[in-house]
A protein has these predicted regions:
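N-terminal secretory signal peptides
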Residues: 1-35, 46-51
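Conserved small-residue
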Residues: 22-30, 43, 50-53, 57-58, ...
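Short, low-complexity, disordered segments immediately C-terminal to signal peptides
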Residues: 61-78
Length: 741
C-alpha cells in the first residue's frame, strides 16, 4: 500500500478507494533434527521428522519459519523438563525520529544499498542512467520500481533450496507500482488525456511485477549477481496460467485467451507469501484502477450482476496510467487489454473481462526461470495484501491468512483440502496444483466479546445464494471471483484497512496490520470493539486528521491452536499513536522511542523466533518523522484486558464510549524504533539470511511527492542532484551478530 500516492483529478487517492457499502458490522528456530539436504530435496523426505520451512515470505509474507511437525508418536514417559529458553531482549538503542533524507540505523549497524530501480540483472545490460533515456527494450532485464514485499530463499551448491543458507540465496521481491515523474525525461507525455509516447508505456509495463535475483555474501558485504541464470523479471506482459475453480470459465475469457485458461501479467504486487514446497506468492492489491471503464458509455451494456461487481471492486475510471489510450495498439493488444469496456460482439472479441484476470494470489517458482506463473483462484479475488502461511504440520491441511487492503474490507483464510506431505518439498508448481487449487475460503467475523468466527465462502451457505439481494451467485467460480460480495453476504466484519499478516512462530497467534482509516469510512458512530477508536490526530500545524489515521494491529488465536478451527479469540496488540496523544488515543502507552503511525509491513524473524519487525507507510505523522522500521517482542492474545475508551468528535460535540480488548503495553523493552527512512518514502518488505545476520529491507518511492523532475524533494539513494530511486538495503551488525538482539 502507498500512503503518499498520487490522486486523480478529483483528489481521490488512486490506491485507497473504499467500495464496501454492505451493512455488515463493522518455520520456528533452526531445528536440531533438520533433514539432510539429500532428504530435503527429494530422497526419503516423506519419512522426515522435521524440516525448516519459510512461512509468510518476508514482510507479511515474511520469512517467519515453522517446522514441519510429524504425526504424534505413541505416548512415552515424560522426560525431565528442559531448561527455559533465555528470553529475547532487544539489543540496540532506539533510533530517533527524523526528517532527513537518509537511512538511519542504530549505532553498531551498517545499512548498504543492494538493488535499485533500473539496476541491470542480465549480462550486457548497461548501468541505469536514471535520467529517463534508457532503452525501453532493456527494462525487462532491469530492477522494477516501488520495491515491496520480498523473501530470501537460501540456495545450496546444488542450486536447490536450502532455508538455512546464510551466504547465497535468491531474493524475490515485488515491484508494486511506479513513480512516473522520474522514469521518463520529463515525466509522462499526456495530451488531452491520451498517452502519446508508446515507449514510455512499455517502460512502465516492465517496471511493475516481480524480481528474482541471486545475492551473495562476500566477506562482510552482500551484492547481487548480475549474470546469474536465476535472475528473472515477471511483469505485466508475462504469460500466466489460471488454476482452481475460476480457470477456464466464462468469467475469464478474453480476446487473448478465448477459453479463459491464461492471461498476461501481474501488477500492484504488494505483500507476498511462501509455500512449504519452496515457491513464492505475490499478491495483486490495488489493481482495479489500472483499467479503463467509462460508466456513462459502458453501464448500459452490462448486466445488473456485472454492475454490482464493478461497484464492489471499484472498476470505473480512465485508468490510472492511461495505458489503454495508446494508439495504434500492438497486434496482441498490449494497450487495448487495459480497456475493460464492451467493444466487440462477444467476450472473446475484446477485454470486457480483463478486470477479472487480476486480484489474485500468483505463485512463482524462483528456482525454475522458465516456469509459467499461476494465478491461484481458489484463494479468492480481492485487493490481496499478502498470503501468510500458518504452522505447517505433516498430515494436516495448509492454511494461508490474507488481508484485503482497502477501507472497510475483510480478513480471510484459505484451508487446503489436501493434507501436507513433506515429500512435496521442492515440488514446484505441481505441488501448488495439489494444495492451492482445492480448499475452503473463509472470512472473519470479529465479535464484540473478544471472540470471532470464520465464515465459509461457499455457494449455498452463509447467505451466498442465487437469492442474495445484492448479487445472485451462480457457481463456485462466481463466488471466488466476487469474494468481496460473498463476504458481504456472509456477514464479515469491516476492518480499518487490513494489510500484512504474520504468524508468531512461538505462539501461533496471527497478527494483522490495520493501517488506518478516515472519518468518512469510520465515523464515530460506527466504531466496533475490533476497530474502536475515533479521534482527531492534529498535526504540528494544527491540521485535523479525523477517524483512525494512525491505525492499529489486531491479533487472534485460532481455537485449540488449530489453524483450521472455525473460532478464535482476539485482542488489539498495538494502537499506533503520537506519544503526546491522550490516553484514549495512545492506548499502548507509546513513548518518543517507539511511537509510530500507519503500521503496514510486518514479519516475524525465523532466526530469532518471537522477534517481530514492523514497518510504516504513513501520511499522518510525517510532519514529525519519515516512515520507519521498529523491532518488537510481543506477548500473546489475552496478555492485556478489556478496556472502555472514550471517543470524541469535538466538531459535532459528540462523545461516545467503546469497549475493546487491549494487549499488554509493550514499553521500550518490547518495542523500539530501529530504522528511519529517507524523505517521502515507505518502509515495506523485509527478509533475512538463513542465519539472521543480514536483514534485507525495501525503501519504496522516496521523493514520490515531488512536483518537478528537476527539483525532487529526495535524492536518495545516490545523493547529489540525482533522481530518487526505490531500493533494497541490506543491514548488518558490525560485530556479526543477530540483527536486533
Amino acid at each position: 500500500m502507498t500512503a503518499n500516492t498520487r490522486t486523480d483529478a478529483h483528489g481521490v487517492d488512486l490506491d485507497d478507494v473504499g467500495t464496501n457499502d454492505s451493512p455488515n458490522p463493522s518455520f520456528t528456530d533452526l531445528v536440531a533434527s533438520r533433514l539432510s539436504r539429500r532428504h530435503l530435496f527429494g530422497l526419503g523426505v516423506g519419512t522426515a521428522g522435521t524440516a525448516l520451512l519459510q512461512a509468510c515470505g518476508g514482510g507479511g509474507g515474511g520469512g517467519a519459519a515453522f517446522p514441519i511437525i510429524p504425526p504424534a508418536p505413541a505416548p512415552a514417559p515424560a522426560p525431565a523438563p528442559a531448561p527455559s529458553p533465555t528470553p529475547l531482549k532487544l539489543g540496540f538503542n532506539p533510533v530517533a525520529k527524523s526528517l532527513a533524507d537518509v537511512v538511519t540505523v542504530p549505532a553498531g549497524y551498517t545499512a548498504s544499498v543492494l538493488y535499485r530501480l533500473g539496476d541491470p540483472i542480465a549480462a550486457g545490460v548497461a548501468p541505469y542512467k536514471n535520467d529517463g533515456t534508457d532503452d525501453p527494450a532493456t527494462y525487462d532485464r532491469r530492477a522494477g520500481d516501488h520495491h515491496d514485499g520480498m523473501t530470501f530463499f537460501g540456495v545450496n551448491a546444488a542450486n536447490k533450496w536450502d532455508p538455512a543458507n546464510a551466504t547465497r540465496g535468491l531474493l524475490v521481491m515485488n515491484h508494486e507500482a511506479i513513480t512516473p515523474l522520474f522514469l521518463h525525461p520529463n515525466g509522462q507525455t499526456v495530451d488531452a488525456g491520451v498517452r502519446t509516447v508508446a515507449e514510455e508505456v512499455q517502460r512502465e509495463f516492465y517496471l511493475h511485477g516481480v524480481s528474482v535475483i541471486e545475492v551473495n555474501k562476500n566477506g562482510n558485504a552482500w551484492s547481487y549477481k548480475q549474470d546469474s541464470s536465476f535472475n528473472r523479471r515477471v511483469h505485466t506482459l508475462t504469460e500466466m496460467q489460471f488454476s482452481g475453480p475460476a480457470a477456464k470459465t466464462d468469467y475469464l475469457k478474453t480476446k487473448y485467451s478465448t477459453d479463459g485458461s491464461k492471461t498476461r501479467g501481474t501488477l500492484n504486487n504488494c505483500a507476498n507469501g511462501t509455500t512449504p514446497w519452496g515457491t513464492y506468492l505475490t499478491c495483486e492489491e490495488n489493481w482495479a484502477g489500472y483499467f479503463r471503464r467509462i460508466k456513462g458509455t459502458d453501464d448500459s451494456k452490462r448486466s445488473a450482476k456485472e454492475l454490482a461487481s464493478f461497484g464492489r471492486y471499484g472498476v470505473a475510471s480512465t485508468g490510472r496510467e492511461l495505458w489503454a489510450t495508446v494508439t495504434p495498439d500492438t497486434a496482441d493488444g498490449q494497450y487495448g487489454r487495459w480497456n475493460t469496456e464492451v467493444i466487440g460482439a462477444s467476450a472473446t472479441d475484446d477485454y470486457r473481462n480483463g478486470h477479472n484476470t487480476y486480484g489474485w494470489v500468483v505463485e512463482i517458482d524462483p528456482f525454475n526461470p522458465t516456469s509459467t506463473p499461476k494465478k491461484r483462484t481458489a484463494l479468492g479475488r480481492f485487493g490481496h495484501e499478502g498470503a501468510c502461511l500458518g504452522p505447517v504440520v505433516v498430515g494436516k491441511p495448509l492454511v494461508w491468512y490474507m488481508g484485503d487492503d482497502s477501507r472497510n474490507e475483510y480478513i480471510y483464510k484459505f484451508v487446503s483440502t489436501r493434507n501436507w506431505d513433506a515429500a512435496d518439498i521442492g515440488g514446484g508448481m505441481a505441488a501448488g496444483d495439489k494444495y492451492m487449487d482445492d480448499g475452503r475460503l473463509y472470512v472473519a467475523r470479529f465479535d464484540e466479546d473478544g471472540t470471532g468466527v470464520w465464515l465459509e465462502l461457499k455457494l449455498g451457505v452463509n447467505n451466498i445464494t442465487s437469492n442474495y439481494e445484492k448479487y445472485a451467485f451462480a457457481d463456485a467460480a462466481d463466488v471466488v471471483i466476487n469474494a468481496r460480495l460473498a463476504a458481504d453476504a456472509a456477514g464479515a466484519t469491516k476492518m480499518d484497512r487490513p494489510e500484512w499478516t504474520a504468524v508468531n512462530p512461538k505462539t501461533g497467534d496471527v497478527y494483522v496490520t490495520l493501517t488506518n482509516t478516515n472519518a468518512a469510512s469510520r465515523p464515530i458512530g460506527k466504531t466496533s470493539a475490533s476497530n474502536p477508536r475515533y479521534y482527531d490526530d492534529k498535526t504540528t500545524a494544527n491540521k485535523s486528521q479525523l477517524g483512525n489515521p494512525n491505525g492499529h494491529i489486531v491479533r487472534f488465536a485460532d481455537e485449540n491452536a488449530d489453524p483450521t478451527s472455525l473460532r478464535f479469540k482476539w485482542d488489539v496488540y498495538l494502537f499506533a499513536a503520537r506519544s503526546t496523544a491522550s490516553a484514549d488515543v495512545n492506548l499502548s502507552q507509546l513513548t518518543a522511542d517507539n511511537d509510530l503511525s500507519s503500521p503496514d509491513g510486518m514479519w516475524f524473524s525465523h532466526a530469532a523466533p518471537g522477534l517481530l519487525w514492523l514497518q510504516t507507510d504513513d501520511g499522518a505523522y510525517t510532519d514529525v518523522t519519515n516512515c520507519m522500521l521498529l523491532a518488537a517482542l510481543p506477548g500473546k492474545v489475552g496478555d492485556g484486558g478489556a478496556k472502555v475508551i472514550t471517543n470524541v468528535d469535538a466538531a459535532n460535540s459528540i462523545t461516545r464510549t467503546q469497549n475493546t480488548f487491549v494487549g499488554k503495553a509493550p514499553g521500550t523493552e518490547g518495542l523500539r524504533r530501529f530504522l528511519v527512512g529517507p524523505v517521502d518514502c515507505e518502509l515495506t518488505g523485509i527478509a533475512e539470511s538463513g542465519d539472521g545476520r543480514a536483514l534485507f529491507v525495501n525503501i519504496q518511492h522516496p521523493g514520490e511527492g515531488s512536483g518537478s523532475v528537476t527539483a525532487p524533494i529526495s535524492h536518495w539513494p545516490d545523493g547529489g542532484t540525482s533522481r530518487p530511486r526505490s531500493a533494497t538495503v541490506v543491514i548488518t551488525k558490525n560485530d556479526g551478530g543477530l540483527i536486533g538482539l
